[in-house]
């Protein structure tokens, strides 16, 4: 049976927040002993806690786990280690009692992988999963992971496959959605950062038959050839879509996006 690293993260979280309250660090071995796992397996747990802190814009809690050198291991990316003390100070200065353990959903037997699988296998399960996962940061990670799976790790507009550059873009903006829509992969597109920004700024969109529409402006005549290729040249082309039709952007979500962001009907006929 696969090990549920999220359940381990749930048990690790209070240990780290207690260390933060005491302004102390903890070694990999000490943490492993505290939760009953080998110290070499700690990195798999810290991956989830680190990602959560980054997504939720929290101080880098995993900076507290140090090796024999007194520094975090090679997998730590949440803070510049050239400024290690400042990273520690931000963690020590945070009142972690204000933060709910974000991994509580694991107590029902859920893992990140199992929830992502549910979202992709049955998109309508999104409302129920949203109610089980209380942390917005975890919800955002789940949504991105589900889109990565649905879109086979490729940007819908360019087919770029470098995961670090890919983001989860909501069709109906998060602030305008109902709970059942926030984790629905049919209300999302996997996009690179550049096109995600243009999509949210109403410079680029998709039609209900999944073609790309770019909104030109007079000042666009001064854009570079690279920008031209990534915008004007995409106009009218078919977006890269999930293989399974049930995972593709839903027309009702696309129409609502057009309404909210001011896209006129003639603009989205290509």
Where are these regions (language model features)?
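Short, hydrophobic/aromatic alpha-helical segments in well-folded domains
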Residues: 15, 27, 143, 154, ...
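A detector for short metal-coordination/catalytic motifs
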Residues: 138, 142, 160-166, 171-270
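Residue-level detection of the helix-turn-helix DNA-binding "recognition helix"
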Residues: 36, 47, 160
């Amino acid at each position: 049976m696969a090990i549920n690293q999220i359940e381990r993260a749930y048990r690790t979280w209070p240990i780290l927040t207690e260390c933060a309250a005491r302004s102390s660090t903890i070694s990999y071995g000490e943490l492993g002993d505290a939760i009953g796992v080998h110290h070499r397996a700690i990195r798999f747990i810290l991956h989830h806690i680190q990602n959560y802190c980054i997504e939720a814009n929290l101080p880098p809690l995993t900076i507290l786990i140090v090796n024999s050198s007194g520094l975090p291991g090679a997998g730590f990316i949440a803070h510049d280690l050239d400024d290690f003390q400042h990273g520690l100070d931000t963690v020590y200065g945070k009142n972690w009692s204000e933060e709910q353990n974000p991994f509580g959903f694991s107590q029902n037997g859920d893992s990140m992988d199992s929830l992502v699988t549910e979202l992709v296998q049955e998109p309508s399960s999104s409302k129920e999963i949203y109610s089980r996962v209380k942390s917005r940061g975890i919800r955002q990670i789940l949504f991105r992971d589900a889109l990565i799976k649905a879109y086979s790790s490729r940007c819908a507009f360019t087919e770029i496959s470098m995961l670090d550059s890919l983001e989860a873009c909501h069709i109906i903006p998060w602030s305008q959605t109902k709970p059942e829509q926030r984790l629905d992969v049919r209300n999302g597109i996997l996009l690179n950062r550049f096109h995600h920004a243009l999509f949210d700024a109403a410079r680029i969109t998709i039609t209900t038959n999944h073609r790309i529409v770019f909104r030109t402006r007079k000042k666009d005549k001064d854009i570079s050839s690279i920008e031209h290729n990534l915008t004007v040249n995409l106009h009218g082309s078919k977006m890269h879509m999930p293989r399974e039709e049930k995972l593709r952007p839903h027309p009702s979500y696309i129409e609502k996006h057009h309404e909210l962001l001011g896209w006129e009907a003639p603009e989205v006929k290509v």
